[in-house]
């Protein structure tokens, strides 16, 4: 996450927790009309997979967080708030989240090249939280990746195991979203990808 994203997560995580959800992370994106603040929420880890986030949950959190941001004002200028479930190909924002998804495949984008590349894909085999490293098994070789050098990381779902493998190649990835009309104002919008519903 960016420094701004971390600042916003630290501010909003307690508020989201009072609503019964965990704030996994945030994206803060500058756009011509102002900015987009995208929050990823999930049910508490102990309640998964029995409980999952619904579109109604996203909308409720969006309303509450929007009102809270109007008071705290951590963002200057116009912005759009989006609240989303993580989906099957969820982003990973913290070392703890990497540890939760031990033995799963991830694709990682790096700020600076490591092991000769800025992009890696492999299985999470170990998380060294004290030293701040994620160890991935890539092509049969264990590679230690500095967590502070990770720009973005995302789970690579086993679609075949989930019974969701596409029947045809090159099909566009379609999403359903629940999102209000975007305006250049501090207006909230709740959205949820179809992939976040099927878990």
UniProtKB/Swiss-Prot annotation:
Keyword Cell inner membrane in annotation: no
GO CC terms: cytosol
Gene3D superfamilies in the record: RimP-like superfamily, N-terminal
Pfam families assigned: DUF150_C, RimP_N
Domain of life: Bacteria
Keyword Transmembrane helix: no
Polar residues: bias regions: 177-189
Entry's Gene Ontology BP terms: ribosomal small subunit assembly; translation
Subcellular location: Cytoplasm
Region (Disordered) residue spans: 167-199
Keywords: Cytoplasm, Ribosome biogenesis
InterPro entries listed in its UniProt record: Ribosome_maturation_RimP, RimP_C, RimP_C_sf, RimP_N, RimP_N_sf
Function: Required for maturation of 30S ribosomal subunits.
HAMAP family: RimP
Family according to the record: Belongs to the RimP family.
Protein name: Ribosome maturation factor RimP
Organism of origin: Xylella fastidiosa (strain 9a5c)
Lineage start: Bacteria, Pseudomonadati, Pseudomonadota, Gammaproteobacteria, Lysobacterales
Name of the coding gene: rimP
């Amino acid at each position: 996450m960016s420094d701004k994203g971390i600042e916003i997560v630290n501010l909003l995580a307690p508020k989201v927790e009072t609503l019964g959800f965990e704030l996994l992370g945030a994206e803060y994106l500058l756009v011509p009309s102002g900015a987009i603040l995208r929050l990823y929420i999930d049910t508490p880890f102990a309640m998964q997979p029995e409980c999952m986030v619904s579109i109604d949950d996203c909308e409720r959190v969006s309303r509450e967080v929007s009102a809270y941001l109007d008071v705290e004002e951590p963002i200057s200028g116009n912005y759009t708030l989006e609240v989303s479930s993580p989906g099957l190909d969820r982003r990973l924002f913290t070392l703890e989240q990497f540890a939760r998804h031990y033995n799963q495949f991830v694709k990682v984008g790096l700020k600076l090249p490591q092991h000769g590349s800025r992009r890696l894909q492999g299985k999470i085999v170990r998380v060294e939280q004290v030293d701040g490293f994620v160890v991935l098994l890539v092509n049969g070789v264990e590679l230690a990746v500095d967590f502070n050098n990770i720009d973005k990381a995302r789970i690579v779902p086993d679609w075949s195991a989930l019974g969701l493998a596409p029947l045809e190649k090159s099909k566009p990835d379609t999403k359903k979203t629940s999102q209000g009309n975007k305006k250049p104002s501090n207006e909230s919008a709740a959205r949820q990808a179809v992939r976040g519903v099927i878990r």
